[in-house]
Amino acid sequence: MAKRFLLGIDDSQYTFEALENLAGLFLKSDVHFHLFLAVTESHLPAPPPTSSEATDWQEVQKRRAQQILDKGVSSLLQIGYKRSRISTETRLQSVNAAQDILNGGKSEEIIAIVLARKQQSGVKRLLPDTTTANIYQYADVEPVWAIGNLPLKPPHVLAAVDESDYADRIATHLAETLGPLPDVRITFLNVMPAKPPSYWDDGHILDKEERGERKGVVKEWQWTYEEIMGGIFAKARGVLTKSGVPEERISTKMQTRRSGPARDILAEVSRGGYNIVALGRRGSGDSQIDPGSRASKIIRSARGCTIMLVN
């Protein structure tokens, strides 16, 4: 069965760069693209002064929208895609572009919603595009990919996982989408959480004997956690090898918390030269993509990387 991506497009340069980046990665696989254009009134050119009929203005809207879609189709054809692998859809006079894109994803049986990461700097980087932010927030079923400006070939993925069931979902999504690609490399990273307060806050200073006992309790907690993560890593590895990823292209890392989960993950992104970061929308400590969540911090700060948000 063909894999279908829904790409929410607009007329920005970022969109077409993202389309070409992603399309180049999947050219030789059975991937189809559904180009979805949700046009809000604010994104349409002003009506010409000579236009007096509403029907004339609607035709102007349709032509402009079709030009954007045609440009996307042309880009894919030039890369080498057959027209049968491309479909298009337009939603004119959209009131909520994010919701229209999400609804389009549900109706098209897609493998992921794809958007362009609009690279910004300074304060603007902390305030993501409204449509993108809303899709991150409310895409509770479909995975969301935000394509960065780093080349995706060859794909080098850092999958940040914890002890929640998102590790299984991330592994499954990676297997379905990137598993068949010949040069993919995937690293699963776990940042061990801080010790629970009950292990260090007793309301009094521990004496020598109590400190010795506490060390044993903490070591047992760490051993149990490592055993749990070892099982999660093994299961994820099995899912990927079954999809065709060679064993030697899968690695796992576990480290103690240093600066905090998000900063530790970002530090590994910088060290490892990854071009894709895969995250769960809700980890064991996050309920949603809010400004202070781990996922939100990584989305804002992983410069140039493509972000996969698995729901």
What are these regions (language model features)?
Residues 62, 66, 83, 94-141:
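Extended, hydrophobic interaction surfaces within ordered domains
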Residues 21, 61-72, 100, 227-236, ...:
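Short, solvent-exposed amphipathic alpha-helices that sit
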Residues 142-152, 299-311:
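Short, flexible loop segments at boundaries between secondary-structure elements
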Residues 1-55, 155-219, 242-245, 251:
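Small/aliphatic-rich secondary-structure junction motif
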Residues 74-113, 238-277:
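Structural beta-alpha unit
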Residues 112-134, 153-154, 262-263, 270, ...:
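Glycine-rich, Arg-bearing micro-motifs that act as flexible, cationic patches
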Residues 34-36, 87-91, 145, 187-189, ...:
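General small-molecule cofactor/ligand-binding pocket signal
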Residues 54-67, 212-231:
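A short acidic, glycine-rich active-site loop
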